[in-house]
């Protein structure tokens, strides 16, 4: 079985959903690796984070991911100055870990060639792509040029965005079945009128 060295799984986790957790659980059960590190994004250049602050996202990530096998959660991007470009994050991880494998989804792969300093990314890390049906990745230019850098893995886990969960929070809708129990117990005590711009009373 191929050994993946250090697996890196990043995301806003705003909040972490049950799909995030199931993806990490599936990968940790399926792949052989030395380290598996989950890291919440710090200051992403192309999106403005809303709702949960960095401390809360990090705390929730530790609560839900560190229950899975030997997963570690890193605050590496919160400690970086400036925008959290992937190549900068990989430079930081490379100081401590060898044989990096960055995990991305299919949507991210399809726009991967547009990422900042993509050549640096490919020099610093291999890429593990969670494959989704309906896409012919073998015809993409980035794959044809760098076949040895990519590993595609079937992803049987359903997808659910944090945006979907945040919209439910803003509308006062129950999120019980879309996040883990620990995440739900933590979030249900938040005043989402204040932090998410919620205009509706809770319906749960």
Regions found by a protein language model. Give the residues of each.
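Nucleotidyltransferase catalytic core that binds NTPs
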Residues: 1-204
């Amino acid at each position: 079985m191929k050994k993946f060295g250090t697996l890196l799984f990043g995301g806003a986790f705003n909040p972490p959903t049950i799909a995030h957790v199931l993806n990490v659980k599936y990968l940790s059960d399926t792949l052989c690796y030395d380290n598996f590190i989950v890291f919440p994004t710090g200051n992403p250049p192309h999106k403005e984070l809303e709702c949960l602050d960095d401390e809360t996202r990090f705390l929730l990530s530790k609560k839900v991911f560190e229950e899975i096998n030997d997963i570690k959660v890193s605050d590496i991007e919160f400690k970086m100055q400036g925008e959290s470009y992937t190549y900068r994050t990989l430079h930081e991880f490379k100081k401590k870990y060898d044989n990096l494998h960055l995990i991305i989804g299919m949507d991210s792969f399809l726009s991967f060639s547009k990422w900042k300093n993509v050549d640096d990314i490919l020099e610093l890390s291999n890429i593990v792509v969670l494959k989704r049906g309906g896409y012919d990745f073998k015809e993409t230019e980035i794959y044809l040029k760098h076949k040895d850098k990519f590993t595609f893995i079937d992803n049987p886990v359903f997808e659910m965005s944090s945006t979907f969960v945040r919209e439910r929070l803003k509308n006062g809708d129950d999120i019980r079945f879309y996040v883990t129990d620990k995440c739900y117990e933590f979030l249900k005590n938040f005043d989402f009128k204040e932090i998410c711009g919620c205009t509706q009373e809770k319906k749960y």
